[in-house]
């Protein structure tokens, strides 16, 4: 418990002290309300007509990790006094990119390699920096990529334990090793996977794979996981941070031709929907979000069934991005109640 919380509890025996504390807190909050003045957004290339960039709509795609990262972004922004509205679980990139372009969304968690494949299927960048540069060359002028996080989560071709055993596949095997056996395998993934370069199109053109059939499921979620476990599909597109891979002894095949590219987590924003303060906040999040932390949080959400919002807040606090204090509104409520004790 913080010293703030301790002092507020001890004041129950001294109503006068509680009144002073409450008055001081109200004064402090009033002063802080003026800390984010309109001057903060002057000459700000990211701020615009949408409440000065301080009324932010954070969206997410239709899978668990995207929702989790959106919660991380949103709670970090809220801690800086920015009003946040969540629009979770919207759908695929084909939908959310358009919503960003028209300003319906302000912020969206993205994966740089997949975004580039969507914008330019022929691009073959060799580094994170060249990936970002290639995206910027194709990105709509109303949008902006912020800093990439060290955290990566790639699409993959993953097989179940039975398939791995049957065809002698291990974690050292590659997607290319499926060429002769793919005609016997059903692959499952999101509906969009069927027509994406980072999907069946690329698996055929880059690796020469022709699967027996394709089963439309979800984006690496419970439907795909269950189908792979039950052998309804023998191969699937799972995200490499998916905790069920280890739990179910699935085998992720290597991607030596880099079809799935770099997949750093990276905020994509609508320029007029986010202030510089908001951009700086998200860049601070990206600086601390690594793959180890993302794996841990994914396991908490997907295996332990924890609320992603709670998981997001806990990580932000541990990373020093949320104040380890009682929230001001909670403090006022506590102090206000204690005045009546």
Segments predicted by a language model, with ranges:
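Bacterial lipoprotein signal-peptidase II cleavage site
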Residues: 32-46
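Short, well-ordered beta-strand elements
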Residues: 52-65, 82-89, 183-188
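Short helices/loops that flank or line small-molecule/ion binding pockets
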Residues: 71, 75-76, 94-105, 201-206, ...
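Ligand-binding cleft/hinge of the Venus flytrap
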Residues: 73-80, 173-213, 314-318
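Short beta-strand-to-loop elements that line the ligand-binding cleft
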Residues: 84-91, 211-219
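Ligand-binding "clamshell"
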Residues: 119-146, 232, 244-257
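A conserved helix-loop-strand patch within extracytoplasmic ligand-binding domains
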Residues: 128-186, 275, 287-291
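Periplasmic-binding protein-like
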Residues: 142-143, 149-155, 242-286
């Amino acid at each position: 418990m913080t010293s703030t919380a301790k002092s507020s509890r001890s004041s129950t025996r001294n109503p006068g002290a509680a009144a002073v504390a409450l008055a001081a807190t109200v004064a402090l909050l009033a002063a802080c309300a003026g800390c984010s003045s309109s001057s903060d957004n002057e000459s700000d290339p990211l701020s615009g007509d949408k409440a000065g960039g301080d009324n932010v709509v954070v969206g997410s795609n239709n899978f668990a990790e995207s929702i989790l990262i959106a919660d991380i972004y949103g709670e970090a922004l809220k801690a800086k006094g920015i009003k946040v509205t969540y629009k979770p679980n919207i759908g695929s990139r084909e939908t959310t990119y358009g919503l960003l372009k028209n300003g319906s969304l302000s912020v969206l968690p993205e994966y740089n390699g997949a975004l580039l494949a969507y914008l330019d299927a022929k691009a073959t960048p060799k580094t994170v920096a060249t990936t970002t540069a290639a995206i910027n060359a194709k990105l709509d002028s109303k949008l902006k990529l912020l800093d990439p996080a060290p955290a990566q989560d790639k699409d993959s071709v993953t097989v179940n334990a039975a398939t791995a055993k049957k065809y002698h596949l291990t974690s050292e095997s590659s997607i290319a090793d499926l060429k002769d056996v793919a005609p016997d395998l059903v692959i499952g993934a999101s509906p969009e996977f069927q027509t994406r370069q980072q999907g069946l199109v690329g698996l055929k053109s880059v690796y020469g794979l022709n699967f027996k059939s394709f089963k439309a499921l979800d984006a690496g979620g419970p439907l795909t996981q269950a189908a792979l476990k039950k052998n309804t599909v023998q191969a699937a597109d799972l995200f490499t941070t998916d905790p069920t891979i280890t739990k179910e002894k699935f085998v992720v095949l290597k991607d030596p031709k880099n079809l799935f590219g770099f997949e750093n987590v990276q905020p994509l924003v609508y320029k007029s929907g986010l202030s510089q303060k908001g951009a700086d906040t998200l860049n601070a999040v990206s600086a601390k979000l690594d793959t180890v932390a993302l794996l841990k949080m994914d396991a908490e959400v997907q295996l332990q069934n924890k609320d992603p919002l709670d998981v997001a807040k806990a990580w932000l606090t541990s990373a020093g991005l949320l104040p380890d204090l009682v929230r001001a509104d909670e403090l006022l409520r506590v102090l206000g109640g204690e005045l009546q004790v």
